[in-house]
Amino acid sequence: MVPPTAVAEGSAVAIKDPVKDTILTPRFYTTDFEAMAAMDLQPNEAELEAICEEFRKDYNRHHFVRNEEFEGAADKLDPETRKVFIEFLEQSCTSEFSGFLLYKELSRRIKAKNPLLAECFAHMARDEARHAGFLNKSMSDFGMQLDLGFLTANKDYTFFKPKFIFYATYLSEKIGYWRYIAIYRHLEKNPDSKIFPIFNFFENWCQDENRHGDFFDALMKAQPDTVRGPIAKLWCRFFLLAVFATMYVRDVARKEFYEALGLDARTYDKMVIEKTNETSARVFPVVLDVNNDKFWTRLERLVANNAALDKADASDAIAPVKLLRKLPFWIGNGAEMAKLFLMPAIDSDRFQPAVR
């Protein structure tokens, strides 16, 4: 079901074609619902119940209400800023809507067997639907919206085992918190760089992301095998690296958006990665050594390879020639990711003992 707040309104709004799926675009996920329903929450049930009680309060129930500041705001943007801002809205809306679909389906499918877990997912689905609808409404200020019903039916869904859903969504929610709060604080100090009134909502908005991340933190502690043992350490390293590398490459590629806000994409991402890495030490057994200069050097090589891949894609060459041109950069990306993964990780007990 598409949330009512996210449905296009008015005949003057055009439906925007979704962007082509790439490794950098938001994914849609599904999982093993029976395994989720059968999960024993007893090892950390008290904390999960406390988090659910926080969700029930719905602190942002009345927060996402548009005001007169939105009127005519879209018309004030120059064409280039308008273009990169619409891209930001689309990516963000798709990501939030992806979360809504996953959480809503989980709440529906596990309700009979695991009511506490189902209720938590229902509350998070409510939040994600609200976010997606608010973003899509902002897109309508630019004369277009996403057809979220079409996305629901036509997007490819990636299957993840429950523990992989936990790792990926925990990081997505926590990184979302740090991204939103960093932009909000920057614009609070630099109001002339606030290109659109949606950024006024980011302070409360990011608290939804933070609470969702806390839920997955508590859920992993209720399933201790997800964060204990050598295999769990490897998976935590993998997901940290995958999420950080994807964000860094994507954001540097669209650095013009951050420049429009008066931010440097690399500096911004470095701060977000450092903060998310530090936060992750509260639940993950290991985190990445993001203070190692080699970490950033190798991310920059991924950026360069990705730019070369984009250039090859944009050329007029025939498909076989494009493939041959792209092959060295795919191999290069694989090699750099392997080097990043093999860098020594940091044990979380040593990294952040006070928090743990």
UniProtKB/Swiss-Prot annotation:
Enzyme type, top EC level: oxidoreductase
A GO BP annotation: photosynthesis
Coiled coil: none
MF (Gene Ontology): iron ion binding; magnesium-protoporphyrin IX monomethyl ester (oxidative) cyclase activity
This enzyme's EC code(s): 1.14.13.81
Keywords: Chlorophyll biosynthesis, Iron, Metal-binding, NADP, Oxidoreductase, Photosynthesis
Reaction it catalyzes: Mg-protoporphyrin IX 13-monomethyl ester + 3 NADPH + 3 O2 + 2 H(+) = 3,8-divinyl protochlorophyllide a + 3 NADP(+) + 5 H2O
Record InterPro entries: AcsF, Ferritin-like, Ferritin-like_SF, Rr_diiron-bd_dom
Cofactor: Fe cation
This protein's pathway: Porphyrin-containing compound metabolism; chlorophyll biosynthesis (light-independent)
HAMAP family referenced in this protein's UniProt entry, alphabetically: AcsF
Role summary: Catalyzes the formation of the isocyclic ring in chlorophyll biosynthesis. Mediates the cyclase reaction, which results in the formation of divinylprotochlorophyllide (Pchlide) characteristic of all chlorophylls from magnesium-protoporphyrin IX 13-monomethyl ester (MgPMME).
Family per similarity comment: Belongs to the AcsF family.
Record's protein name: Magnesium-protoporphyrin IX monomethyl ester [oxidative] cyclase
Organism, scientific name: Synechococcus sp. (strain CC9605)
Upper classification of the organism: Bacteria, Bacillati, Cyanobacteriota, Cyanophyceae, Synechococcales
